[in-house]
Amino acid sequence: MKITKITTYRLPPRWMFLKIETDEGVVGWGEPVIEGRARTVEAAVHELGDYLIGQDPSRINDLWQVMYRAGFYRGGPILMSAIAGIDQALWDIKGKVLNAPVWQLMGGLVRDKIKAYSWVGGDRPADVIDGIKTLREIGFDTFKLNGCEELGLIDNSRAVDAAVNTVAQIREAFGNQIEFGLDFHGRVSAPMAKVLIKELEPYRPLFIEEPVLAEQAEYYPKLAAQTHIPLAAGERMFSRFDFKRVLEAGGISILQPDLSHAGGITECYKIAGMAEAYDVTLAPHCPLGPIALAACLHIDFVSYNAVLQEQSMGIHYNKGAELLDFVKNKEDFSMVGGFFKPLTKPGLGVEIDEAKVIEFSKNAPDWRNPLWRHEDNSVAEW
């Protein structure tokens, strides 16, 4: 079997799918994207495709190493996202050829279900509370919320009080009927993170995500030493070498590699094993589409330390398409009591509606995150 063609499709709301075709008619799907940089990743996919055309798709490990090492310059969000989507598609092909789901090829299940959580957008307490109520009606009891709006490097007590007030009202509204993590989104400087984490402790969040940016990872153990709240990070780390530094430094309790950013299934399985050796749990980052989610689920079901799975159903970014709009076998992604079951169809287990993908890829919008500025007109972290 040989790879004959790679096609990419930029899609709403902010996704990109790729299709790898073979000379035997077996097709694999992947989801390579950096949100807001889809065209750049698309170019990288097709550059890497030069290494793949005519090659045997079953040699996943070798092809991964070729894509990673052969170009001399390596790593980073663009190249690792391109590799990630290609890697997903190669695993999809292998599973289809062998008539087995990817988790079966990786040694079989370590669990029968995995807890899912849902993003709730909005910064106003009333909007967040309404969003939680809506999602609870369809079975969710675990959520992730914005931990704050933009903060200055040293900000005032009013900004801190505003962030804490939102969380306080949510805990008051729902008590211990729900659990929620708080995403600082890298918006907070290390000095302000110390202040904000201390103020949020009484409301017992499940975790705090990206308390500071990954490039400030030396602060993770310092922040962890002052709080009992688990700290989480990983969406802006792109290989096991990025995660190695964080694991060695300590401070992070939950790793969040993104299966569409951090080298795909092949790399993230290694990252999961590294985390387990440090007694660190796994909660793959996934505010993306169905192929990315499917890839995450296969890792969840073979990784002992996986504890939570993010998914994008109803997420505030989904303008123009919802999580399962391009999926034929929607029922396989159904949740029971807030848990996903293993996908059982061969490969990744997601059947893509290709005709719909082609139609929606025509004139797909180029999503960009907003540009925020502080009161003094300097650029703020989004």
Curated annotation (Swiss-Prot):
Q: What is its EC number?
A: 4.2.1.6
Describe the disruption phenotype: Deletion mutant cannot grow on D-galactonate.
The family assignment reads:
Belongs to the mandelate racemase/muconate lactonizing enzyme family. GalD subfamily.
Biological role stated in the UniProt entry: Catalyzes the dehydration of D-galactonate to 2-keto-3-deoxy-D-galactonate.
**Marked site: Increases basicity of active site His:** D258
Q: What induces it?
A: Part of the dgoRKADT operon, which encodes proteins for the metabolism of D-galactonate. Negatively regulated by DgoR. Induced by galactonate, but not by glycerol, gluconate or galactose. Repressed by glucose.
Per UniProt, where does Mg(2+) bind? D183, E209, E235
Tell me the GO BP annotations in alphabetical order: amino acid catabolic process; D-galactonate catabolic process
CDD domains annotated for this entry?
D-galactonate_dehydratase
Name this polypeptide is given: D-galactonate dehydratase
Mind telling me which residues the site (Transition state stabilizer) is annotated on?
A: E310
Any one GO molecular function term: galactonate dehydratase activity
